[in-house]
From Swiss-Prot:
It comes from Pseudomonas aeruginosa (strain ATCC 15692 / DSM 22644 / CIP 104116 / JCM 14847 / LMG 12228 / 1C / PRS 101 / PAO1). Belongs to the AB hydrolase superfamily. Pseudomonas lipase family. Gene3D superfamilies: alpha/beta hydrolase. This is Triacylglycerol lipase. The lineage of its organism: Bacteria, Pseudomonadati, Pseudomonadota, Gammaproteobacteria, Pseudomonadales. Residues 35-280 form the AB hydrolase-1 domain. Na(+) increases lipase activity. Inhibited by diethyl p-nitrophenyl phosphate and 3,4-dichloroisocoumarin (DCI).
Amino acid sequence: MKKKSLLPLGLAIGLASLAASPLIQASTYTQTKYPIVLAHGMLGFDNILGVDYWFGIPSALRRDGAQVYVTEVSQLDTSEVRGEQLLQQVEEIVALSGQPKVNLIGHSHGGPTIRYVAAVRPDLIASATSVGAPHKGSDTADFLRQIPPGSAGEAVLSGLVNSLGALISFLSSGSTGTQNSLGSLESLNSEGAARFNAKYPQGIPTSACGEGAYKVNGVSYYSWSGSSPLTNFLDPSDAFLGASSLTFKNGTANDGLVGTCSSHLGMVIRDNYRMNHLDEVNQVFGLTSLFETSPVSVYRQHANRLKNASL
């Protein structure tokens, strides 16, 4: 009888010990020193009808300690205009979080956008990481730029794309003002990218396909990208990205919209993930390659990398 009566007490003590064990304490795997700020690409958004642009990524980062802010800038405009819009939000985030700096992560056109902020206000930026960003331009943008400037074809196409940008802005939680698809095109083609790089060279490789400076003006630079336009036959976006990949010349490795060498910035973590341009943000709806690590895991690993670098 005595032995039986002591069993509940023993269980209670055991459970209390387990609760105190570090094995089940909240993980800090993604708990960076500074907040993580996500910046979307061309025709991007923060959230539409409950669907995140960064599909499942913010919640996965927050789960293990990261402080994450999702921004929204103009869906279509130049890198400088988008950069100024992002800078305003970064200043608000710094004030709100109480931290003096942030870690920027930009996808696609978000890459040049975060570079602008890091270049003009390095005091606010701990790191700048680009994902599938066309730092030296995109062959797809070069292909579209062959449409004669000022032509009826250009006017019709830019009008349609601007309307799409306006619709995305309307449906999302942000209000990003007017759309400027021609500004985006000028920023993302090879000539426009070269002009931007001349003004803001931080982290850009000096060789055709090498790495850039890892740290400039106190800002750490990183990048990664995919190299497989077709990754999941169930993903409806693969057809579009497979077609757009045909605009790349001489068998250039690409993710459907951005060449792998063009994606290089600072420390190149990897440029050959089995991912296409939308897989890089876990779209569409997480339909990515079954033969590659989850994009969400890549972001979590990078947050841990930043944490270990005291960023």
